[in-house]
UniProtKB/Swiss-Prot annotation:
Keywords assigned: Antibiotic resistance, Cell inner membrane, Cell membrane, Cell shape, Cell wall biogenesis/degradation, Hydrolase, Membrane, Peptidoglycan synthesis, Transmembrane, Transmembrane helix
Role of this protein: Catalyzes the dephosphorylation of undecaprenyl diphosphate (UPP). Confers resistance to bacitracin.
EC number: 3.6.1.27
Name under which the protein is recorded: Undecaprenyl-diphosphatase 1
Catalytic activity, as annotated: di-trans,octa-cis-undecaprenyl diphosphate + H2O = di-trans,octa-cis-undecaprenyl phosphate + phosphate + H(+)
Miscellaneous information on this protein: Bacitracin is thought to be involved in the inhibition of peptidoglycan synthesis by sequestering undecaprenyl diphosphate, thereby reducing the pool of lipid carrier available.
NCBIfam families referenced in this protein's UniProt entry, alphabetically: PRK00281.1-2, PRK00281.1-4, undec_PP_bacA
Gene designation per UniProt: uppP1
Source organism, top-level taxon: Bacteria
GO biological process per UniProt: cell wall organization; peptidoglycan biosynthetic process; regulation of cell shape; response to antibiotic
Molecular function terms, GO-annotated: undecaprenyl-diphosphatase activity
């Protein structure tokens, strides 16, 4: 296997793992990184599906005990059924809109200006929500995932719909949306992790079924390297983020989004990257 391709696979896997669960938009980062690394567009499209799968496996591993407890508790435990129902309720709106508007989103919004605007506006929204949190000066209404109501889950699910716009960030929309609707910062972050499981698994299955011909024996090694890199980096990132939100807000990520959005606009129109 070509060592240059191995390095590219490692780099893209790490980028995916580090950005998938932070409120910074993994899509924007992968587009820029993939173009700089000169990944072939079709190869990059398939590879993105694989490394996303690696990232979500990291969340499954981090929360494996909770997931097992929920699955085994479904027949008899009310808490397990309520948790599952909340995840389903929060997942359905985005899935419905994605199926309805997938082609429109890809044809209209995958361009430098929409992605850059989404990054910058998302950063501004984070600054506003964090400022609102400081002004309130009192504890958030929902202090535990188990205290989430179906209405809370629906609100977070509606917020997740904004993530269909490239550059918004699925994690950003669910975490910040959750905080806006009364979830404590860590609760919003953890619920965002759990929502990623059905969303990314579903997207992986859908894209794999649609482009199954792109998966061939020659690419298995490259995909395995990218998946492993995404898994390890995502696992480290998830653990770090849980520690970070215990004593920090998301203001730094907001400013990063704004700067990165301007960078995307610059490289998109300068010809430095090939926009997919």
């Amino acid at each position: 296997m070509d060592w240059i391709l191995i390095c590219k696979a490692l780099a893209l896997g790490i980028v995916e793992g580090l950005t998938e669960f932070l409120p910074v938009s993994s899509t924007g980062h992968l587009i820029v990184a993939g173009s700089f690394l000169r990944f072939h567009p079709e190869q990059a499209k398939t590879f993105d599906v694989v490394i996303q799968f690696g990232a979500i496996l990291a969340v499954c591993w981090e929360y494996r005990r909770r997931i097992v407890d929920v699955v085994t508790g479904l027949p008899a435990q009310r808490e397990a059924r309520r948790f599952t129902m909340n995840v389903v309720i929060a997942t359905l709106p985005a899935i419905a809109l994605a199926l309805l508007f997938e082609k429109t989103i890809k044809s209209v919004l995958f361009a430098p200006v929409p992605v850059a605007v989404a990054l910058v506006v998302g950063g501004a929204v984070i600054l506003w929500v964090e400022g609102r949190q400081r002004e309130r000066g009192k504890p958030s209404r929902v202090q535990s995932i188990d205290a989430l109501t179906p209405l809370d889950a629906l609100k977070v699910g509606l917020a997740q719909c904004f993530a269909l716009i490239p550059g918004v960030s699925r994690s950003g929309s669910t975490i910040i949306g959750g905080m806006l609707f009364g979830l404590e910062r860590r609760v919003a972050t953890e619920f965002s992790f759990f929502l990623a499981i059905p969303v990314i698994f579903g997207a992986t299955l859908y894209e794999t079924a649609k482009d199954w011909h792109a998966f061939n024996v020659d690419s298995i090694g490259l995909f395995a390297i990218g998946l492993a890199a995404a898994f390890v980096s995502a696992f480290a990132c998830v653990r770090w983020l849980l520690r970070y939100v215990a004593s920090h807000d998301f203001t730094a990520f907001a400013w990063y989004r704004i700067v990165f959005g301007l960078f995307v606009l610059l490289v998109g129109y300068s010809g430095w990257i090939e926009w997919i």
